[in-house]
């Protein structure tokens, strides 16, 4: 077990961080996609008595409604430019000498080039018109002045335009550009602004946007499925906590059909109280990793908890990676981790094939095709669990699978569910990538502001909206929104219609 741990540690440190298993499949399943290359040898395929024969596979193919592999991908080539981009025509003309004597001339499009206009700093001077009136009252004349109403700003008194503030938000939360680098970029263009000013803008903008995030949360809780995940964040000035201690950014993904939402929430704790608060009032399916903090939430709120096969697969992949390499000239003997990984990979292969289908069709296919594979996995683990060291990586992976089994098989009962929590992990990835650049938040207030901005940006992206354009529209409209209906109109799915 110590050797196993050392090999895994060495692989994690030096090897590429891909989770693709070297051992893909021990069987030539009839459903296997043509694009999946099987590297297992015939000896490995025959190693386990449970491996189906060719006759078995032919019978399976006759019984199951097998989906044909997707057509081969087209060869890569130049993609056409988006039709919604503005276009400017540049006319290349002949000289008078060259076209002398021609009966006519005409233009043809010779080529297209993608162009960019670099950022440019300017000063907007608001010239407010005022009118002077002379009012006569009891033989006395008094001057009265009225002024044109200035547009409302979400941060009154700020020296930056809404466009500049949104530019700062998008650069940090979409592009992972820390404020100190934005400070130097603005200075290069002639705009002298300190990073403290930029940080204050980020916190100030979060206040009016909180109302919008609250409404998005209400819509998310009205859906049938929520996916949840959490990741670490360092907040330096969290009261009562060391600067180096772990705090957490939580993400929930869900919403009714046509109203996808991604919500972030900062909390210094990883206790069950946080998800309890985030999904209060929700009833449906909650898909998570194996973190025990979600268990009490689901029991208390009568929520069906869905497991994540990604985490299960990852544990068997670690067990596979930690195996000793076969000596030169000797055949590789497939291990129990290899066998289980092959079965798990078959589950994923089925999911890729049925991806275009409706929820009802997915449910049917899972019953016909995934259920038998799940039964094989469970039977194999039950038969072999006592044959491996309990504290070894394969033993730990088997224990995890057994403990999570009911949650891992729930996805086969509803075609709307996913085999893994990968969508929540993908939703939190922009935060993880950004964290590598800006490293930490200084204060809890800043971390909460970041959660609000990530929520709106990622929800806008999930609804097909460009974040910069969307946030400018929202921040110009919010100061004039006096009712819930007016704020509702600014939700991303209402603007994409």
Specify the residue positions occupied by each region the protein language model found.
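Short, flexible loop/hinge motifs at secondary-structure junctions
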Residues: 1-159, 227-228, 254, 366
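Catalytic center-proximal scaffold of phosphoryl-transfer enzymes
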Residues: 45, 74, 80, 88, ...
């Amino acid at each position: 077990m110590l050797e196993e741990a050392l090999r895994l540690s060495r692989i994690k440190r030096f090897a590429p961080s891909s989770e693709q298993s070297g051992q893909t499949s021990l069987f030539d399943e009839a459903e296997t996609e043509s694009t999946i290359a099987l590297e297992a040898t015939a000896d490995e395929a025959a190693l386990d008595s449970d491996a189906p024969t060719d006759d078995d596979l032919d019978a399976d193919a006759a019984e199951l409604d097998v989906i044909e592999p997707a057509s081969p991908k087209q060869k890569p080539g130049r993609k056409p430019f988006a039709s919604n981009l503005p276009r400017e025509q540049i006319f290349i003309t002949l000289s008078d000498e060259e076209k002398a004597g021609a009966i006519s001339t005409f233009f043809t499009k010779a080529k297209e080039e993608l162009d960019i206009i670099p950022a440019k700093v300017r000063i907007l001077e608001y010239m407010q018109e005022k009118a002077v009136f002379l009012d006569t009252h009891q033989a006395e004349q008094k001057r009265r002045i009225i002024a044109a109403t200035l547009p409302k700003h979400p941060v009154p008194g700020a020296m930056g335009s809404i466009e500049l503030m949104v530019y700062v938000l998008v650069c940090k939360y979409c592009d992972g550009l820390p404020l100190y680098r934005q400070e130097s970029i603005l200075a290069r263009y002639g705009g002298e602004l300190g990073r403290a000013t930029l940080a204050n803008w980020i916190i100030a903008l979060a206040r009016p946007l909180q109302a919008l995030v609250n409404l998005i949360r209400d819509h998310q809780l009205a859906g049938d499925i929520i996916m949840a995940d959490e990741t670490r964040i360092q907040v330096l000035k969290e009261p009562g906590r060391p600067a180096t201690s772990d705090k957490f950014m939580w993400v929930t993904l869900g919403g009714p059909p046509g109203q996808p939402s991604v919500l972030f929430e900062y909390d210094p704790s990883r206790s069950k109280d946080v998800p309890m608060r985030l999904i209060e009032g929700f009833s449906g399916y909650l898909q998570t990793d194996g973190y025990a903090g979600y268990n009490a939430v689901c029991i208390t709120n009568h929520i069906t908890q869905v497991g994540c096969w990604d985490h299960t697969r990852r544990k068997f992949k670690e067990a596979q990676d930690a195996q000793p390499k076969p000596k030169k000239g000797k055949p590789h003997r497939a291990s129990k981790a290899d066998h289980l990984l092959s079965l798990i990979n078959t589950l994923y292969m089925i999911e890729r094939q049925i991806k275009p289908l409706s929820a009802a069709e997915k449910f049917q296919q899972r019953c016909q095709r995934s259920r038998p594979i799940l039964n094989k996995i469970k039977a194999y683990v039950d038969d072999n669990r006592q044959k491996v060291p309990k504290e070894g990586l394969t033993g730990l992976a088997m224990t995890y699978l057994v403990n999570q089994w009911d949650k891992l098989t729930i996805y086969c009962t509803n075609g709307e569910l996913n085999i893994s929590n990968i969508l929540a992990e993908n939703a939190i990835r922009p935060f993880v990538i950004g964290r590598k650049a800006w490293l930490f938040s200084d204060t809890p207030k800043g971390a909460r502001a970041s959660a609000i901005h990530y929520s709106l940006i990622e929800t806008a992206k999930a609804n097909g909206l460009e974040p910069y354009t969307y946030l400018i529209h929202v921040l110009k409209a919010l100061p004039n929104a006096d009712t819930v209906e007016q704020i509702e109109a600014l939700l991303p799915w209402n603007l994409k219609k």
